[in-house]
From Swiss-Prot:
Recorded catalytic activity of this chain's protein: a quinone + NADH + 5 H(+)(in) = a quinol + NAD(+) + 4 H(+)(out)
Compartments, as annotated in UniProt: Cell inner membrane
Pfam families from the UniProt entry: Complex1_30kDa (PF00329), Complex1_49kDa (PF00346)
Annotated EC: 7.1.1.-
Family designation: In the N-terminal section; belongs to the complex I 30 kDa subunit family.
UniProt protein name: NADH-quinone oxidoreductase subunit C/D
Main location: membrane
Membrane in keyword set: yes
SUPFAM superfamilies linked to this entry: HydB/Nqo4-like, Nqo5-like
Membrane topology according to the record: Peripheral membrane protein
Length: 593
């Protein structure tokens, strides 16, 4: 499928005021309090009593906001720079995305500590289910009407809500952990699945259902991921995905690290994405700081991000083919990944987790001889992709296992918050590198691979074609690498250019302070989304004018992708579920953070 047949995506409209006019016309300007931010979208505060009505309007307006992109909370109690905003102890925000407008809007509602409840919106957007569960889990905010408001990241027996400001952030602030036999039995009992809790029946009219645990330790679960299957024979009647086993508190960690020292933690979100994880974070921090990086920095960042797109997709390809029964290709794809990592290691000094991007630039300049390494890889990979396509992807057995399996359309994808190859496999031509170019992607020539059926096979083929386009982008970076510095000339560039510290005492002082305490960012909010390896990844940062983030919201693509599983796989066979899980391309750190 080509872009000519796809849904038309208009040019990106940052800070789109059209929706503000529509809202004012419908509800009156007095219903909203506008908040100036550096998020690139209108941010509007509304009263809780009108929240559901306003969100329903946005969902049904002409050119609707079909996707609930994100929903989460903020503990406002210690925030000092609120700039005349509505009084709030806690805030719940709703980030809505319209494909047909190519614009976003954020709605916020203020809550007092004595009345922490907001009506559920699961009847408007089905993917609000998990987001509301996480907000309750992390902040203790209630959502009346929610079908199953329960822990999602933390264990069922957990006490407290970790993202509250009064909840400890370090292990040393807790009592020493011990696991007694009684506590072990309590935890095991809490993990027991009870169908009635999820509205499931144990038997039908003429059959008894079997309930099967797939995971949390199963090779086809691709990580610490558990799915409880309700089976009639081998047919899946329903299922309940169970996540949180890989949760490490990444957003809590961000509140205790400086803006600079949090960069290595971003690598551990999608741990196959490498520097791709650094990019939305440093771009969002640079928006706060007002830093414009040199052109060379943009090109270097794009080149290395595309290298990691390729390494991630190669791992996906090998393991996906292995999931459906072919054992050999994974060894070949790992050989190709090693060739890519040879280039990555030569340039960054590291392999999987380089933590190489910096606020205002990159860690160091490109080494001598980098062009030959890149050229050798660019010449190598296309022929290998041809082999994979011919030998494996055109194989009749693989097609029989994946064509028509776990299919969904564009409307369903948007309702569940699906992005990346999963969305483009339905024919929706929405790739942020084209639709909302960042870091200079508008200067590169490449195509957006699309498919039409939205099934397990199409999701695979889209990623294979994406690797070909990444090679084109890397080749253009290699041939057109600009001259110039690899860091911005800005006071908040961290660390500052080292050469100047040997000549100017002011720069030496700045270097010392920014490395020890960290740079001080202006009080504001910023947001940046990118087209990451598994879909759209973004960082929404709140600065209170300090050396650390007041609130860091990490929105990952894999979280909504797993939430969609029950709606897609009902009525299919267990073997189809394995093919479906492989086609999603997820890692649990990207889900659980």
């Amino acid at each position: 499928m080509t872009a000519d047949n796809a849904l038309y995506i208009p040019p990106y409209k940052a800070d789109d005021q059209d929706v503000v006019v529509e809202l004012n016309n419908r509800f009156g300007a007095e219903a909203f309090t506008a908040q100036p931010t550096r998020t690139g979208m209108p941010v509007l505060w509304v009263e809780r009593a009108r929240l559901f009505e306003i969100l329903t309007f946005l969902r049904n307006v002409p050119k609707p906001y079909s996707m609930l992109y994100d929903l989460h909370g903020v503990d406002e109690r210690l925030r000092t720079n609120r700039r005349g905003l509505p009084g709030a102890d806690f805030t719940v925000f709703y980030h809505l995305l319209s494909i047909e407008r190519n614009s976003d809007v954020m709605i916020k509602v203020a809550l007092s500590e004595s009345d922490l409840s907001v009506p559920t919106i699961t009847s408007i957007w089905p993917n609000a289910n998990w987001y509301e569960r996480e907000v309750w889990d992390m902040f203790g905010i209630d959502f009346p009407g929610h079908p199953h408001l329960s822990r999602i990241m933390m264990p069922p027996t957990w006490e407290g809500h970790p993202l509250r400001k009064d909840f400890p952030a370090r292990a040393t602030e807790f009592d020493p952990y011990s696991l007694t036999l009684a506590k072990q039995q309590l935890e095991e009992e809490a993990a027991r699945f009870r169908p009635e809790d999820w509205g499931m029946k144990r038997s039908g009219q003429n059959e008894d259902y079997m309930f099967l645990n797939l995971g949390p330790n199963h090779p086809s679960a691709h990580g610490a991921f558990r799915i409880i299957l309700q089976l009639d024979g081998e047919e899946i009647v329903d299922c309940v995905p169970d996540i949180g086993y890989h949760h490490r508190g990444a957003e809590k960690m961000a509140e205790r690290q400086s803006w600079h020292s949090f960069i290595p933690y971003t690598d551990r979100i999608d741990y196959l994405g490498g520097v791709m994880n650094n990019l939305p974070y440093v771009l969002s921090v640079e928006k706060l700081a007002g830093i414009k990086v040199p052109e060379k920095v943009d090109v270097i960042r794009i080149m290395m991000a595309e290298f990691f797109r390729i390494t991630s997709h190669l791992l996906f390809l090998g393991t996906y083919i292995q999931d459906v029964g072919a054992m050999t290709p994974v060894f070949f794809t790992f050989t190709d990944r090693q060739k890519a990592y040879t280039v990555i290691e030569a340039i960054t000094g590291f392999r999987l987790h380089p933590a190489w991007y910096r606020i205002g630039g990159v860690a160091h300049d490109l080494p001598r001889g980098w062009e030959k390494l890149v050229k050798d890889f660019v010449d190598w990979l296309p022929k290998r992709l041809d082999e994979y396509t011919k030998a494996a992807l055109q194989n009749s057995i693989l097609k029989g296992r994946t064509v028509g399996v776990a299919a969904y359309n564009t409307k369903e994808a948007l309702e569940w918050g699906v992005t990346g190859a999963g969305l483009r496999s339905t024919g929706c031509d929405f790739d942020l590198r084209k639709a909302r170019p960042y870091s200079g992607y508008e200067n590169f020539e490449f195509e957006v691979p699309l498919a039409a059926n939205g099934d397990a096979y199409d999701r695979c083929m889209v990623r294979v074609e994406e690797m070909r386009q990444s090679i084109k982008i890397i080749d253009q970076c290699m041939r057109n690498m600009p001259e110039g510095p690899y860091k911005a000339d800005h006071p908040l560039t961290t660390p500052p250019p080292k050469e100047r510290t040997l000549q100017h005492i002011e720069t030496l002082i700045t270097h010392f302070l920014q490395v020890s305490w960290g740079p001080v960012m202006p009080a504001n909010e910023s947001f940046q989304m990118i087209e990451a390896t598994k879909g759209i990844n973004s960082y929404y940062l709140t600065s209170d004018g300090g050396t650390m983030s007041y609130r860091t919201r990490i929105r990952t693509p894999s979280f909504p992708h797993l939430q969609q599983i029950p709606s897609v796989i009902q009525g299919s066979m267990v073997a189809d579920l394995i093919a479906y899980l492989g086609s999603i391309d997820f890692v649990m750190a990207d889900v659980d953070r």
